[in-house]
């Protein structure tokens, strides 16, 4: 049963699904769609042509779908789409998009922690975690299963590849290749996100191929393009390696991050249970 508190403001025209809860003093504007089992907590504000997927919770004082912070915006009809079973925590802001018909999108099962900011024309994949105060500028693309630590700033038009992990307080100015881990301002790649991939049950053989790919691309004397070609020849049967190469070859407004933390070790066991080491 849907439960809307008497002090909540739900404008005529808003589409409210089954078993939705809207707590005291929340505001839901007329073009909003709340799917089944959504919870909107006290003082949350949802505006614009916003759709929030089933089972998602919007926590107190979060703001979704409000006017983008972009001087190019001239009142066009734009959209926000949030997937299922997400947690949009306190004071997070997800603005609407800029340019007619465009969308800010967030996938399923995402955790957006307090004070995070997702700007106009951003795209965020599934199973993503943004820690407190993560700040995305406009047009940023974030792949699936990405974790970004607290107080990270991401420059507009940057792409962050799937399964990567960005350390806290980093400054991201260039595209982050998938499956990598890094930190810093300026940012430095530390290697492959071994622990994250293991937790996602990526196989030992795949992790090994990715570590060798990283070493070839970022720690060899080959040119960048030549190293991408050679890893395809040697490890092209591994889908994750092909994805890594395709990401690095795609058109980019910012370029691929190639700064590497040379002190980061690639000799650690990538699976304690299997006990395997990768030689440097």
Curated annotation (Swiss-Prot):
<dbReference type="InterPro" id="IPR011004">
    <property type="entry name" value="Trimer_LpxA-like_sf"/>
</dbReference>
<comment type="function">
    <text>Involved in the biosynthesis of lipid A, a phosphorylated glycolipid that anchors the lipopolysaccharide to the outer membrane of the cell.</text>
</comment>
<dbReference type="GO" id="GO:0005737">
    <property type="term" value="C:cytoplasm"/>
</dbReference>
<keyword id="KW-0444">Lipid biosynthesis</keyword>
<dbReference type="Pfam" id="PF13720">
    <property type="entry name" value="Acetyltransf_11"/>
</dbReference>
<keyword id="KW-0808">Transferase</keyword>
<keyword id="KW-0963">Cytoplasm</keyword>
<protein>
    <recommendedName>
        <fullName>Acyl-[acyl-carrier-protein]--UDP-N-acetylglucosamine O-acyltransferase</fullName>
        <ecNumber>2.3.1.129</ecNumber>
    </recommendedName>
</protein>
<dbReference type="InterPro" id="IPR037157">
    <property type="entry name" value="Acetyltransf_C_sf"/>
</dbReference>
<keyword id="KW-0677">Repeat</keyword>
<dbReference type="InterPro" id="IPR029098">
    <property type="entry name" value="Acetyltransf_C"/>
</dbReference>
<comment type="pathway">
    <text>Glycolipid biosynthesis; lipid IV(A) biosynthesis; lipid IV(A) from (3R)-3-hydroxytetradecanoyl-[acyl-carrier-protein] and UDP-N-acetyl-alpha-D-glucosamine: step 1/6.</text>
</comment>
<dbReference type="GO" id="GO:0016020">
    <property type="term" value="C:membrane"/>
</dbReference>
<dbReference type="Pfam" id="PF00132">
    <property type="entry name" value="Hexapep"/>
</dbReference>
<dbReference type="InterPro" id="IPR018357">
    <property type="entry name" value="Hexapep_transf_CS"/>
</dbReference>
<keyword id="KW-0441">Lipid A biosynthesis</keyword>
<comment type="subunit">
    <text>Homotrimer.</text>
</comment>
<keyword id="KW-0443">Lipid metabolism</keyword>
<dbReference type="GO" id="GO:0009245">
    <property type="term" value="P:lipid A biosynthetic process"/>
</dbReference>
<dbReference type="GO" id="GO:0008780">
    <property type="term" value="F:acyl-[acyl-carrier-protein]-UDP-N-acetylglucosamine O-acyltransferase activity"/>
</dbReference>
<dbReference type="InterPro" id="IPR001451">
    <property type="entry name" value="Hexapep"/>
</dbReference>
<dbReference type="InterPro" id="IPR010137">
    <property type="entry name" value="Lipid_A_LpxA"/>
</dbReference>
<comment type="similarity">
    <text>Belongs to the transferase hexapeptide repeat family. LpxA subfamily.</text>
</comment>
<keyword id="KW-0012">Acyltransferase</keyword>
């Amino acid at each position: 049963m849907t439960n809307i508190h008497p002090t909540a403001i739900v404008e005529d025209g808003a589409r409210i699904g089954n078993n939705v809860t809207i707590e005291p003093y929340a505001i839901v504007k007329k073009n909003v769609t709340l799917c089944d089992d959504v919870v909107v907590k006290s003082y949350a504000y949802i505006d614009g042509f916003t759709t929030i997927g089933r089972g998602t919770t919007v926590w107190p004082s979060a703001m979704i779908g409000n006017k983008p912070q972009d001087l190019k915006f001239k009142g066009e009809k734009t959209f926000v789409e949030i997937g299922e079973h997400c947690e949009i925590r306190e004071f997070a802001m997800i603005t609407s998009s800029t340019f007619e018909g465009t969308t800010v999108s967030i996938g399923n099962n995402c955790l957006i922690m307090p004070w995070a900011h997702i700007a106009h024309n951003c795209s965020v994949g599934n199973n993503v975690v943004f820690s407190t105060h993560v700040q995305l500028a406009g047009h940023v693309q974030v792949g699936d299963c990405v974790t970004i630590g607290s107080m990270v700033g991401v420059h507009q038009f940057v792409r962050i590849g799937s399964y990567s992990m960005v350390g806290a307080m980093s400054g991201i100015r260039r595209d982050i290749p998938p499956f990598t881990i890094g930190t810093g301002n300026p940012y430095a790649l530390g290697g492959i996100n071994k622990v994250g991939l293991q937790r996602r049950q990526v196989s030992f053989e795949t992790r090994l191929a990715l570590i060798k790919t990283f070493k070839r691309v970022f720690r060899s004397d080959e040119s960048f393009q030549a190293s991408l070609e050679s890893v395809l020849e040697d490890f092209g049967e591994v889908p994750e390696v092909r994805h890594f190469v395709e990401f690095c070859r795609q058109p980019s407004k910012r370029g691929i991050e190639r700064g590497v933390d040379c002190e980061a070790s690639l000799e650690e066991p990538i699976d304690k249970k299997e006990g395997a080491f990768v030689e440097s």
